[in-house]
């Protein structure tokens, strides 16, 4: 016989007059004039239990209850007295009059109150089991479950087959460092945990499983950020005989359906933007369209100005000069203060910028002025070093109005894109940005397409793949892979939502000769290609179908949906930013015997510093 009849949080006024049996944890116990009230909690929420002293044995047990005791309650559902209804709870119109009370397991005093919102992350992760009892975490993980179920339902309805691929595979160069697993049987050889199932899912297409998916763990040994984990969950999908447009349409429908069924959110239109346009307008390949600020291209304007910071960047190979107009940023009342501007100047240095030039637009009507006083309606130390034609062009291109502030970025294009792109987001999300309608609180999805096939690595002096080396070039671009790799555009695509890359993919190369051209462009020799990817090259020769796919980061999707500050808030047992599990103390030393069996001898290990 089941130990309970209902979940605590699902007991409502539809059960009035019925006897229920509940199991859960004591959230709070209150003694009011001889009557004890106990809030009992489970994954679905709370219900109030009333313990009356008329039942002496039961009441004695209730007197001994403390927070986090695991208990069983049997009692009668009745309406709460007038004036005590709690509209914020599903169970807020009723209470349970306790008839029987059993302590299933007492609890020691918890190291913190579960309703404490100011806990450090170290405390939360060290005591993760208790942290997971908090409604915030329970709601996050329940949403994660529902999203995964909706994804499975959609894919199943569209003919996709869930197929597992190996966790122990071959180490291949895919960008990040592999997590290696030593082989006991094959001395000196290692498996690698998968960074993605990329090659196996392509092999499944060759094998004839034309619609594949799995929700799987992937592993990357890389430096961690707020949106990264060494192990993460991927919704991995591949399909044959669909065009790039077909693939994007199908999985746009999937994400739209998931948001509607789980959050009742209509995502609306997904604008499609080329990579080059995204970088030109926002300095990012995952722009946050909620922020109503855009770059203004000024490189061509600044080639002959006396201000060397601008002219140097404008004339250097790979340099860029942009403006970022902040409407209302120079107003005397409600504009950005000198302290805020100085803080932004320090902020962009994080991204390699040397400083942050600006012009305050006070009164355009005063015009360019004269030699004695140039541009009297503008306020900036750089105006004197920029000729009138350039200043007029800056004002025209940016659409500047009285009270506006124009920030400038001038350096190598990557530094400008990173620094001014980050500044755009920071200002947009600031209180100033929200008060001045520079930020729109909404869901803004989009597709970014037409990525370059390759980018040049200055340090290694060779081209690297922007997505991965199995991405197909656009039709007509194959020959450029050899003659002009920098011109070659791929059939890659990313789905972006509110500045986060939710998922990305591409049409794949399905011909061995084209795949070899990519390896040639990447300076991967035929011998290395055969050693690393011979199994794929061989498979492509057996009538491989046209195919493509994508992968969504489940952790990121849930982070976006919940508004969590960290991806660690949507994973049951995450790692810290130092790739440690504070709950289990992993990684940890292992027994010398285990190392000998694996043919491993350690250098003297350094102790792990505390997180």
From Swiss-Prot:
Listed GO CC annotations: cytoplasm
Binding-site positions, ATP: 220-222, 229, 501, 553-556
Family classification: Belongs to the class-II aminoacyl-tRNA synthetase family. Type 1 subfamily.
Cellular location(s): Cytoplasm
Important for tRNA non-discrimination (site feature) positions: 32, 83
Function description: Aspartyl-tRNA synthetase with relaxed tRNA specificity since it is able to aspartylate not only its cognate tRNA(Asp) but also tRNA(Asn). Reaction proceeds in two steps: L-aspartate is first activated by ATP to form Asp-AMP and then transferred to the acceptor end of tRNA(Asp/Asn).
Keyword set includes Protein biosynthesis: yes
Database matches in SUPFAM superfamilies: Class II aaRS and biotin synthetases, GAD domain-like, Nucleic acid-binding proteins
Catalytic activity: tRNA(Asx) + L-aspartate + ATP = L-aspartyl-tRNA(Asx) + AMP + diphosphate
Enzyme Commission number, as recorded: 6.1.1.23
Subunit structure as annotated in this protein's UniProt entry: Homodimer.
GO BP: aspartyl-tRNA aminoacylation
Protein name, per record: Aspartate--tRNA(Asp/Asn) ligase
Aspartate: annotated span: 198-201
Residues holding L-aspartate: 174, 220, 467, 508
UniProt GO molecular function: aspartate-tRNA ligase activity; aspartate-tRNA(Asn) ligase activity; ATP binding; nucleic acid binding
Protein species of origin: Albidiferax ferrireducens (strain ATCC BAA-621 / DSM 15236 / T118)
């Amino acid at each position: 016989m089941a130990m309970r009849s209902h979940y605590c949080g699902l007991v409502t006024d539809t059960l009035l007059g019925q006897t229920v049996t509940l199991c859960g944890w004591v959230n709070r116990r209150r003694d009011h004039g001889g009557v004890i009230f106990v809030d009992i909690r489970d994954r679905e929420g709370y219900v109030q239990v009333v313990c009356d002293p008329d039942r002496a044995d039961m009441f004695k047990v209730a007197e001994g209850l403390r927070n986090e005791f695991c208990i069983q309650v049997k009692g009668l559902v009745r309406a709460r007295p007038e004036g005590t209804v709690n509209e914020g709870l599903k169970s807020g119109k009723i209470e349970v009059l306790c008839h029987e009370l059993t302590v299933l397991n007492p609890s020691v005093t918890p190291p913190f109150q579960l309703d404490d919102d100011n806990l450090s992350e170290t405390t939360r992760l060290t005591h993760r089991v208790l942290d997971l009892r908090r409604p915030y975490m329970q709601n996050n993980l329940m949403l994660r479950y529902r999203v995964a179920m909706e994804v499975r339902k959609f894919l199943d309805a569209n003919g996709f087959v869930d197929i597992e691929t190996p966790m122990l595979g071959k180490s291949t160069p895919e960008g990040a460092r592999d997590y290696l697993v030593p082989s006991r049987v094959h001395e000196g050889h290692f498996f690698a945990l998968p960074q993605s199932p990329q090659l196996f899912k392509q092999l499944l297409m060759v094998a004839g499983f034309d619609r594949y998916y799995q929700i799987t763990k992937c592993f990357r040994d890389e430096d961690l950020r707020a949106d990264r984990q060494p192990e993460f969950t991927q919704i991995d999908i591949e399909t044959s005989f669909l065009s790039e447009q077909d693939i994007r349409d199908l999985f746009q429908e999937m994400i739209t359906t998931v948001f509607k069924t789980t959050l009742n959110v209509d995502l609306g239109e997904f604008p499609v933007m080329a990579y080059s346009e995204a970088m030109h307008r926002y300095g990012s390949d995952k722009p946050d369209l909620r922020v109503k600020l855009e770059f203004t291209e000024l490189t061509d304007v600044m080639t002959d100005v006396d201000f060397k910071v601008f002219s140097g960047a404008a004339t250097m190979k790979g340099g860029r000069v942009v403006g970022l107009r902040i409407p209302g940023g120079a107003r005397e009342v409600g504009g950005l203060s000198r302290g805020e501007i100085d803080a932004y100047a320090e902020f962009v240095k994080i991204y390699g910028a040397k400083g942050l030039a600006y012009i305050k637009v006070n009164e355009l009507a005063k015009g360019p002025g004269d030699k004695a006083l140039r541009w009297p309606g503008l306020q900036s130390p750089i105006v004197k070093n920029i000729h009138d034609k350039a200043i007029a062009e800056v004002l025209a291109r940016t659409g500047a109005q009285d009270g506006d502030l124009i920030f400038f970025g001038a350096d190598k294009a990557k530094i400008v894109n990173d620094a001014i792109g980050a500044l755009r987001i920071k200002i947009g999300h600031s209180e100033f940005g929200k008060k001045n309608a520079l930020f729109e609180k909404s869901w803004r999805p989009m597709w970014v397409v037409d990525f370059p096939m390759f980018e040049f690595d200055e340090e290694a002096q060779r081209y690297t793949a922007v997505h991965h080396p199995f991405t197909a070039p656009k039709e007509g671009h194959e020959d450029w892979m050899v003659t002009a790799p920098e011109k070659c555009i791929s059939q890659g695509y990313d789905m972006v939502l509110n500045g986060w890359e939710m998922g990305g993919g591409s049409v794949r190369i399905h011909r061995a000769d084209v795949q070899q051209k990519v390896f040639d462009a990447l300076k991967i020799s035929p011998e290395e290609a055969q050693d690393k990817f011979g199994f794929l090259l061989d498979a492509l020769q057996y009538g491989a179908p046209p195919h493509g796919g994508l992968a969504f980061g489940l952790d990121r999707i849930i982070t976006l949906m919940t508004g969590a500050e960290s991806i660690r808030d949507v994973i049951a047992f995450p790692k810290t930013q130092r790739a440690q599990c504070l709950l289990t103390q992993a990684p940890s030393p292992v027994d010398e015997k285990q190392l000998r069996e694996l043919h491993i001898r350690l250098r003297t290990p350094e102790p792990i510093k505390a997180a």
